[in-house]
Amino acid sequence: NNGVGVASPGFRCRFLPVKSCLDASTTSIDNGYDGVYYAADHGCDVINCSWGRGGGPSQFEQDVINFAVLDHDAVMVAAAGNTSSEEADYPPAYTNVVSVAATSSNDAKAGFSTYDFSVDVCAPGNQIYATVYNDTYTSYSGTSMASPIAAGGVGLIRSRFPSMNALQAAEQLRITCDNIYNTPTSNSAYRDKLGKGRINLYKAVTDTTSPGVVVENLTTSDYNDNVFIAGDTLRFQALFHNLLRPTTNLTCTLTTSSTNITILPATFNPGAVNSGDTISNFSLPFRAIINAGTPL
């Protein structure tokens, strides 16, 4: 510690800056996915993307992310966006990306931060002191500041648990978050749209017991024409994959806050699930009824 400037959460992690814009660009990321490919191909364990766009998904972009995460074992971390609204931006909303929203110092959602069901975690992003050009420092606000804090946390996790692969390290970051929905802030309006909560790096590097069960390949069907209308009974089937430590008494329950849906009693109790195992509820799918009068 030389007492100058700032320090990264990713203490002693090496970093590789990747240029992803043209010389003439001032605010545009022109070749972001080329940069992701380059970073993965050059052995980066964590790739931070403090950039993104609105609109729909692209299979090409998802393929580049899968190349980085699944083929080259790099954790992809991306800023959720600064729209102050509920929306899915890209790359943060892609599969296999850790989407990071921003919080303020009291754990409330930062006013500028995008929120969405696709968000995975939050990190501080309001008035973050950082380096800038010409050997100076300044404070910035944005999910672009929150994302590298989360990425640095992943660097710590991968240093602490070197046997973890990319998906496991990302899940370790997620499951060790602090719950910020029940704190004395205004986050209740964003329930489940700020991910698991605000990252806690101490827990992330000390928790050696928690499992990490994720839902994969969720499908919804009415066992008819799959045109959902009031009165239909929907069936939800999924795979449940345990990325981390074994469970002893796993219980999966379907819930909703919507008054237009009635959940039928259906709790899936797989019990013990070993690390790396995948199970399904195909034989006992979750069920829910779309109530009469529901606008569709």
Task: Annotate the PLM regions.
Residues 1-57, 67, 101-104, 160-166, ...:
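Subtilisin-like peptidase catalytic core
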Residues 57-76, 96:
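Catalytic-core regions built around general acid/base machinery
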Residues 206-231:
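Low-complexity, acidic Ser/Thr/Pro/Gly-rich terminal tails and inter-domain linkers that flank the onset
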Residues 241-268:
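Short acidic, flexible loop segments centered on an aromatic residue
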Residues 262-294:
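Intrinsically disordered, low-complexity Pro/Gly/Ser/Thr-rich segments with frequent PxxP/GP/PP motifs
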